[in-house]
């Protein structure tokens, strides 16, 4: 008698985030556009840049990098998200995979980004170490995560919508897992990286109407069991 193997945290998140990939792409991903623009500008992504978005979702950041002339790649756990990314950037190399085991060779990229992705890794230090492995020496690695949840309008919105969102995998970290001051820096140092700077970008969540807001907000993967900012140690 055989038993089904338990899905990994990455696989479980892939199923949950992929459930409403089209809604994410149409209504929600654009709320992060100011962050994409700021990061691509700071890292000077342009013609010939080898660019990887780790946790690429439906590919908006990759599409923006491609529009600047970059050679883009992306990895994500959700195949439906990757399908949208491939439509947006037919020349891109988009692969299903885990942040802790990136399916790319050493020193393959000039710039590696992770927008709202590394906080969901079961082992964020391992994921950051992988980002360092695939980045070339002297390359840039940029990790975007939410600020502290206190006072954030989005927290009240997502709290109100909790009954409409699926539960996260047992024991999985939540959206604010890397938000405590110093946590991301410490994990990056533990991964062998040398943090250079921390900067804030305002990214208002604005929707055309209530229907768009509901579809966008309910495409955001899972609810959080509690709005904790603690991260699991490596």
Predicted regions and their residues:
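C-terminal helical/coil "lid" or tail adjacent to the Rossmann-like core of SAM-dependent
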Residues: 3-6, 10, 17, 195-234
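Helix-to-beta-strand junctions that scaffold the AdoMet/dcAdoMet cofactor pocket
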Residues: 121-122, 135-137
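Short glycine-centered segments of the SAM/dcSAM-binding site in methyltransferase folds
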Residues: 50, 139-140
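Conserved class I S-adenosyl-L-methionine
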Residues: 2-49, 60-64, 81-84, 88
């Amino acid at each position: 008698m055989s038993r089904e193997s338990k899905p990994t945290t990455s696989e479980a998140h892939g199923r949950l985030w992929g459930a409403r990939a089209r809604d994410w792409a149409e209504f929600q991903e654009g709320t992060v556009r100011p962050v994409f623009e700021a990061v691509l500008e700071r890292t000077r992504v342009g013609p010939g840049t080898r660019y990887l978005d780790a946790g690429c979702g439906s590919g908006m950041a990759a599409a923006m990098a491609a529009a600047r002339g970059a050679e883009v790649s992306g990895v994500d756990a959700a195949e439906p998200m990757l399908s949208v990314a491939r439509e947006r950037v037919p020349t891109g190399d988009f692969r299903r995979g885990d942040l802790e085991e990136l399916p790319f060779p050493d020193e393959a990229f000039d710039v590696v980004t992770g927008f709202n992705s590394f906080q969901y890794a079961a082992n964020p230090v391992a994921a950051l170490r992988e980002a360092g492995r695939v980045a070339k020496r002297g390359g840039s690695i940029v990790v975007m995560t939410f600020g502290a949840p206190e006072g954030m309008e989005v927290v009240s919105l997502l709290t109100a919508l909790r009954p409409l969102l699926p539960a996260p995998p047992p024991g999985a970290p939540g959206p604010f897992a890397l938000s405590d001051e110093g946590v991301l820096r410490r994990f990056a140092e533990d991964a062998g990286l040398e943090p250079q700077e921390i900067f804030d970008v305002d990214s208002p969540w604005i929707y055309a109407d209530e229907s768009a807001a509901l579809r966008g907000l309910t495409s955001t993967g899972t609810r959080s069991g509690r709005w904790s900012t603690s991260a699991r140690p490596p």
